[in-house]
């Protein structure tokens, strides 16, 4: 008797991305034959273990087979089409994988906020009930008199206190982050939110960070799941977006 441990993937793109990273393959030049063989090996493993194979995995397998077939077909072209740029059968798949990579990185960054919250905000303590009964040897009249005195004392001390609700906006936090980064071009996200007064402020700061990443003003890296986020300033103008680049 032996046990086989099989990794579970959220969907076909999750599996494909795993195979690409495992084989250290360039997204822009995917060897379809190698990836298809490994992909089908995983599908067969599921079937051998009598596990249901989701329809989207089958659809992706068919797509990979089609791409491989198109790449193997003889390239007969008419003379008038000779000057046209030949379309790579992998092009659409590469676009989808690049998009998936973006969402995967954002999801990892979002998961990091949970770990940061746990670091800065304590959970509510467990309150264990302790029964300590005390006998009150007072009459109703005594209690009423004490209550009346408390009311009179409070009237004398009554002062209106206005508590101004702090408002945080993504725009203001973007400006704040840029101010930090101009002074210190490389820092940890925990350094930014260390003095945050509420969870809301931490969340708004994180959304501001995502916006700066989208604008290519900063690069962010997270070494471990739920870990701190390392931020690098790319300058006031940022840099041009390169889908194939991995920071």
Curated annotation (Swiss-Prot):
UniProt-listed Pfam families: SMC_ScpA (PF02616)
Assigned keywords, A-Z: Cell cycle, Cell division, Chromosome partition, Cytoplasm
Annotated GO biological process: cell division; chromosome segregation; DNA replication
Superkingdom of the source species: Bacteria
Cellular compartment(s): Cytoplasm
One annotated Gene Ontology cellular component of this protein: cytoplasm
Function comment: Participates in chromosomal partition during cell division. May act via the formation of a condensin-like complex containing Smc and ScpB that pull DNA away from mid-cell into both cell halves.
Assembly behavior: Component of a cohesin-like complex composed of ScpA, ScpB and the Smc homodimer, in which ScpA and ScpB bind to the head domain of Smc. The presence of the three proteins is required for the association of the complex with DNA.
Family, similarity comment: Belongs to the ScpA family.
Protein name: Segregation and condensation protein A
Gene, per the UniProt record: scpA
């Amino acid at each position: 008797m032996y046990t086989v441990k099989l990794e579970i993937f959220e969907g076909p793109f999750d599996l494909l991305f795993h195979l690409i990273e495992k084989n250290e393959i360039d997204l822009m030049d995917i060897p379809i034959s190698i990836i298809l063989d490994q992909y089908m090996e995983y599908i067969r493993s599921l079937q051998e273990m009598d596990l249901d194979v989701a329809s989207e995995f089958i659809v992706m397998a068919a797509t990979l087979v089609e791409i491989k077939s198109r790449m193997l077909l003889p390239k007969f072209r008419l003379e008038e089409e000779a000057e046209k740029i030949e379309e790579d059968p992998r092009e659409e798949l590469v676009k989808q994988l690049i998009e998936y990579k973006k969402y995967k990185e954002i999801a990892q960054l979002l998961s990091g906020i949970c770990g940061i919250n746990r670091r800065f905000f304590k959970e509510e303590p467990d309150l264990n009930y302790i029964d300590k009964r005390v006998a009150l040897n007072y009459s109703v009249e005594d209690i009423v008199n004490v209550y009346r005195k408390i009311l009179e004392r409070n009237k004398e001390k009554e002062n209106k206190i206005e508590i101004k609700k702090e408002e945080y906006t993504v725009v203001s936090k973007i400006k704040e982050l840029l101010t930090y980064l101009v002074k210190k071009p490389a820092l940890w996200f925990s350094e930014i939110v260390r003095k945050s007064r509420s969870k809301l402020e931490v969340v708004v700061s994180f959304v501001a960070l995502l916006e700066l990443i989208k604008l290519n003003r900063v690069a962010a890296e997270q070494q471990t799941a739920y870990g701190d986020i390392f931020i690098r300033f790319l300058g006031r103008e940022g840099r041009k977006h390169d889908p194939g680049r991995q920071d």
